[in-house]
A protein has these predicted regions:
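Glycine-rich beta-alpha junction loops
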Residues: 15-18, 40, 136
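Structural motif
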Residues: 8-10, 29
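Short, well-ordered loop/turn elements at secondary-structure boundaries
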Residues: 5-6, 15-16, 126
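ATP-binding/phosphotransfer module of carbohydrate and carboxylate kinases, centering on a glycine-rich
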Residues: 2, 10, 45-189
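Short beta-strand scaffold segments in enzyme catalytic cores
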Residues: 11-13, 18-24
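Active-site glycine-rich loop that binds ribose-phosphate moieties when present
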Residues: 1-5, 38-41
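Eukaryotic endomembrane system proteins
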Residues: 21-40
Length: 189
């Protein structure tokens, strides 16, 4: 929020799991948990079950390394099914860097999931900005995820598309963001 010079920010990290944080329109961090990893984004009875919570349709299954690994066979990519999720992500990102269309489908699918989920999150959060980050968004795949999410918002939720800006941290935000936030913390004691 500080480096963006705006508030009403929902930050979503797509990595080993899914993490999130929210800064309200007044620049405050609210006193509730923003545990979107276990909030449902797929309400279909056949949605993917989360191995930890046992719930179906949880965000973590759609916005993390697990999502990439789950989509690998559906995209027709042959990887060892016993390969750890981080390694599968790296392999898919390598394929994407080489222009592989099957890898592209994985990131497009995650982007579609994200577009619909942002619209769903907007039912609960006053959002002007969505900041997407994490290992899954590294490289060209992250750009594709944002493009597809934006396409979904424009096509299905045009009013939200006009009011919500999607972004990833630029290099300065990555390098200086934590230091700026830490320097702004009040002293305790």
């Amino acid at each position: 929020s500080m480096s963006m010079k705006d508030n009403a920010v929902l930050g979503i990290s797509l990595g080993t799991s899914m993490a999130s944080g929210y800064v309200d329109p007044d620049g405050r961090i609210r006193p509730w948990l923003n545990e979107l990893a276990f909030a449902p984004v797929d309400y279909d009875n056949g949605a993917t079950a989360d191995e930890w919570s046992q719930d179906i349709g949880c965000g973590v299954q759609y916005f993390s390394q697990q999502a990439v690994a789950r989509l690998v066979p559906a995209a027709g990519i042959a990887l060892d099914s016993g390969m750890p999720f981080p390694e599968q992500l790296v392999e898919v990102q390598k394929l994407m860097a080489n222009g592989d269309e099957k890898a592209r489908l994985i990131f497009e699918t995650i982007g579609v999931y994200l577009g619909y989920s942002i619209a769903h999150y907007a039912n609960f959060y006053d959002i002007r900005n969505v900041l997407i980050l994490g290992r899954v968004t590294s490289g060209q795949g992250g750009e594709i995820i944002l493009q597809k999410a934006d396409e979904v918002l424009r096509a299905e939720f045009p009013a939200l598309s006009e009011s919500i800006k999607l972004s990833t941290p630029d290099e300065q935000q990555k390098r200086h963001g934590q230091a700026v936030a830490a320097a702004s913390l009040p002293s305790i004691g």
